[in-house]
UniProtKB/Swiss-Prot annotation:
Comp. bias regions, Low complexity: 25-53, 73-90
Extent of Acidic residues compositional bias: 95-105
Compartments it resides in: Nucleus
Name of the protein in question: DNA ligase 4
Amino acid sequence: MALSLYYDEDDDENENENKDKPNNDFKNQQQINTSKTTNNNNNINNKNNYNNKFNDDDIFNNDKIITKPRVTTTTTTTKNTSTNSNINKTKFNDDDIFDDEDEDSNSNKTTTTTTTTTTTTDTIITNDYRYQKTVPFSSFCDLMNRIINDTKISNKKNYLEKFMNHYKDEPNNFYQLLRLILPQLDKDRNSYGLKEKTLARLYVELLNISPESVDAMRLLNWKKSTNDEIGGDFGTAVYLSLKNRCNNDNGRIKVSMGDINESLDQLSQPLTDKKTKVSILKKVLRSTTAQEQKWFVRIILKEMKNGLSDNITLKFFHPDAIDHFNITSNLRLVCTNLFYMTQSKQKELKDKQKLEEKENLLKQQQQQQNDLDIYKLEIKLFNPIKPMLANRQSIDNLSMILNSAISATQFVVEKKFDGERIQIHKDGEQVKYFSRNSNDSTGIYGSMFTPIVKECVLAERCILDGELIVWDSISQRFEDFGNLKTLALNKDGISGSGDPLGINYGKQLCFIAFDILFVKDQSVMNLPLMQRLMLLKRCVTIKSKQFEISEQTTVNSISQIISLLESAIINREEGLMLKNLHSLYVPAERKDKWVKIKPEYIDGMGNGADDLDLVIIGGYYGSGLNRRGGTISHFMLGVPFIADSTDTDIDDESTFDKNVIFYSFCKVGSGYTDIQLKSLQKDLDPHWNNFSTSKPPSIIQLAEPFKEKPDVWIDPRVYSKVLQIKASQIVVTDKYKCGYTLRFPRVLKIRDDKGWKDCCSHEEIIDLFTNYSTNLNFKRDHEYGDGSGGKNKKLKKSKKTTNQLLADSGLKVLSIFQDTDTSGIIPTQNIFQGIEICVIKGSSGEYTKSKLEIMIVEMGGSKVQYPSRNTNYVISSKEVVKIQNLIQSGFIDIVSFNWIVDCYNEKRLVPLGPKYMIFSTESTKKRFLLDSDQFGDSYINETTEQSLKDSFNQIDKLKLKKQLSINSTTTTTTTSISKYFSNCWWSLFKEFTFYLDLYQVVGEKSTLIENNNLELSNLNIQFYGGKISIEFNNKITHVVLDSLDLSRITFIKNKINSLSLPIQIVTTNWIQLSINNYSIQPILEILD
């Protein structure tokens, strides 16, 4: 037998019977004549042979170069024309393509006509593989090997050109070749549903080898390098595992490119089950060499890794191929249109000019083709158009762009939504959706959203460009991008319980249309944006929060843009889009006609993600054939979290280390040099542990169910490295345990001088996000703690304050974050000495934010841009949106700017009183009551006209705010009770706040779950000192579920994870068991 594979029993029984027969695993398999002859034409007349065959005689032999015009060639090459007459270009000979020494080996093959049809929206050419049947797949593989092994682009293109010059000039032939060279651009075939992990298991099954064997371990752990082999490339792993098991080239039946294409067609059929896929893979495996298998799996994975970009390959095929592909996203159309266009023009040139004049005319023709007007290309429905893209620009460059405007209404600003860029194609009742990469997303969104499209899109035939996002009708806001496909695919997190009120309850898809490309059988891309928007409004009817048109705001100054960006930040929006109303729609173009403005593009704006020290907790093996493939080249970074803060001895270092765990936070793989990476690898290598989902480490906490897991993990308490990270933005996520992550992180420095205790804590990450999301949204429990979180003080604050970062940057920031340069201000008074003040907003008149900060420094005080535990007062002009979250947290006094002005004018520290207060903490209100009544009327000072006015104003305020002194009395009473009766049996739950799972929508009383069994637990909890909360907030310690109905466990877990709160889930049984035993029972014992 030629194979070293393990066959099924049926194969073994028939081995002797079939050993002399050709391998018929491929239908229409070619039969090889192993006898060598010098007369290659003897069998050409065989009636079964296809009369146009690929001829690869000495294709890469520099002494025998065959050159002829191809689709991309517009000049006639005359070099070595003397050899052309001796070579039959229509017959394939695969013996001496890559071996220049062995020139006498040829093979005769018999082929059968094979034609298959691929169903597409617009079928132009059937998959005719007759010519492909004459091209050995080994020739294609040898071509790829030569390209990948040569580092020079010019040599790569030279190999490709030599191969093409031997290739038959027909559009279908070029298409079948290009879809193998560029499988990632082939949209005719559906997804194979085969990735590295699946393929590895299938190969182990096909080879019938032990999963513990060397070859199996190489496949299953293909990313890992060993002492002898470099990992990171699955194709190479397949080759090494099969090279001693598969066919070799001696006397075998060669598989053709047509055979491979047929197998790929079969694998991509949408209803192909696993058994059928295994059968197809087995046929290919038994008929190919290890080298051919390597390239076969790379085609399946759509990762050729040959060093030639998509654009280089397309441009090599034809100068206008890139433009055509951007318009059609269809390789088949590109090959067809450009081939016939070139052939026609070349024929005209032959009739008009002599051979010596042809070269110059063809050069002119090439220039004309390069200047092809893309707007004259035919637009067809259901052929996705590459979307026009937006450029990134700084504030300074935006000024230049706006100054170049020829009219005051030339530019508009739109909101930038955090969704998926989607192109909607509508032809009557048929609607399709395409992603920005031209992938068909109809299967994902069609069933849910097509009825909305039919209702809202009035045009019969059109192409719309826009953003698909998720609207949450309960929270009344747009969701983050990560929730889009979860909603569309109905992954409600209920784990099959059938509960309709999962994490998707109250959510719906919403399409924000911002452009129209095609309407009424005509492209409108050549119209200016202003006209396209007018057409768009005529073609669409608005349906709130389901199908809308992006709102435009005309701008002509930087101040307007900054104001809009401030609002976007406050509203947690992703950013803005600046568009030129005179711009035409150019597919795949990224220029300043459209500009995206995000907070992270404005350096130093204090978005909370500028400069963080994070510890390495995991590693990832790199993939590919580059220098990082097969090594730990990417890292999972984490932050420490104190798992148990109830111990009183916070200075006990061993106890502190014992209680810390590490939450996963982000993944980084850039910013360091190869030398730095090798140094990290050397230092960390002895400490890595393989990560297993069946036995995850307790010290490293990942988001369940392991949405982002490393290949290896490390215990930072034993050894690790701290990396200084720069990122663009901090965002909410469910991929990491922290609940947040960084966008576009990169390493600034490896901090060998720091350990894990010096890096950012989980508490600080929460503060960073709240700073970014609502400017000054701090949560009291995380910033100051509630008296039980003192242990976190052991974590040193290694990160710079936002104020320091802003000062270091020296760049422009938004007004709400602007730090006034007071380096030249010399304090003239000591009124505010030792007092730290944060100014949020000044008046709109004389006393601006900047002037107030200067006054504070002149009076000896210190100013910051964000309040911290050391900040004494926050200053503002009124109850603006930016301080609402601070008011809700209740931990800091917010004072009117008038107090600063009065202190400055009177040159003394004016006592604070109710008239200055925008918000008073409980302690401040108590202090005020010692000197005056609740309306500010002093017990000591004489009443004046002004003080009486102030008292009346305070009465109005108190009527609105209901700030009564009874609250402080109640708090005092509760504290006293806890002090003297804390150990009594009736105080069992005194430290806990419970949320009872009574409502289908959390906190919504109108959605009460009928026939629940939680009423008794409600009474017991309150009787035994516990508190009940009807809101899901950070004060909750436990969520109580009905022991008889645990269907909502997953929903509650998702809710807790989304808020990143340390809340425990218990059942009514746990409540009763704790009461029966007069002590709090272990929770895990009950839930298990």
